[in-house]
Amino acid sequence: QNHSLDYFLPEDVSYNSEIPKPSKVLGFVPGDWHISHDKLVQYMYTLAEASDRIQIENRGFTYEKRPLILLSVSSQKNLARLDEIKRKRQVLTDSQLNNADFDNLPVVVNQGFSVHGNEPSGANAAVVLAYYLAAAEGKSIENLLNQTVILLDPSFNPDGIQRFAHWTNSNRSTNVNPDPIDREFYETWPGGRTNHYWFDLNRDWLPVQLPESQARIKTFYEWRPNILTDHHEMGSNSTFFFQPGIPQRTNPLTPKLNQDLTEKIGNFHASALDSIGSLYYSKESFDDFYYGKGSTFPDVNGSIGILFEQGSSRGHARDTQNGVLRFPFTIRNQVEASFSTIKGSIAHRVEFLEYFRDYYTMVSDEAKKASTKAYLLGGHDDYTRTIALLDVLHQHKVSIRPLTENVEMQGKVFKANEAFVLLTE
């Protein structure tokens, strides 16, 4: 089926003709082919050069030396005061200094795509989302940009996206074949799910052992976004999932208000998908438990993590129990979920900011009431392991102090400058 860029975009919106459409740079409309990471980067830099709504940065490189780019998207006024916005947000995490002025504080939405490289609708949707944010005109987009700072991470897994796009595009027929036994759907091992070292990056938000994760975590703590989205795919016979997940499988450390706010924004997802006639479900199939995943890590940091799962076309079109599932359709659903996230974040901006502030006040109060006031780390057996642990803790902004004198506890001697103290307050 032929489609145009309009297939993905809201109706009755005009666009700045000076902002290049994806097809002008990529050579195809999103969904006709799978975007490779090099083309994705090329388009994002082209957008940033053409638009005064976008700032782009490279936060490092993958093992295969692909850039880990991040787009900051907002109004010109907000972009000019990003450092000020960051400082005000950091104040909210200090229970002694948290009387912030919410009237002038935008909500921060971190939108991340395709941490599993062979779940490509997310990264391809990021292209459409970026174009809309850069080119749309009118009061609606102006209001959106004034009230939000969008951190757009178009590819959580550049090496995996590149690997999968190469396979799928190389095996695409001129006339797309939806037969599930077609070669296009049998990606060779190790596949695009993982990074260069075949590690599942959606398990690394806590261990932070890999460059992709380290860049993400640095961005997270620099901004501490109110919402972080994690766009995935699932089996081809499925429809579309958005959180909350299974209520009984939510981590007990996650506040109930977190799940209530997740459900509030879920109403916006439902409305958006209803408007285009797409099927969806929630509160089933997926948990919200392990904090080392992209959709749950924010939940223990005063943010709202949201998982999206789109039934995958795997290639360009695939026969399923529900009929032929085409790649552009999967992209469209991810785009709609991106729009609805932003719309919901604006509608509940003050609630998200209040929750963010109150979360850190609650954590501080809990620490004061706790019987354990400090932890002793290291000082014996394996100093190298101690240093490795300290590196992880430092990346998570956990304050550690070296012992200034020897301490003996439970028959063990913890030596000065070889052991460390982690205070709970």
PLM feature spans:
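Short, conserved secondary-structure transition motifs
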Residues: L145-F164
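Aromatic- and acidic-residue-enriched carbohydrate-binding clefts of CAZyme catalytic domains
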Residues: P180-F199
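Aromatic- and acidic-residue-enriched segments that line the glycan-binding/catalytic groove
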Residues: Q162-P178
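Intrinsic-disorder/low-complexity accessory segments
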Residues: Q1-P120, N124-L151, Y197, R203-D204, ...
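Active-site-proximal loop/turn and secondary-structure-junction residues that shape catalytic pockets
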Residues: F156-P158, E233-G235, S312
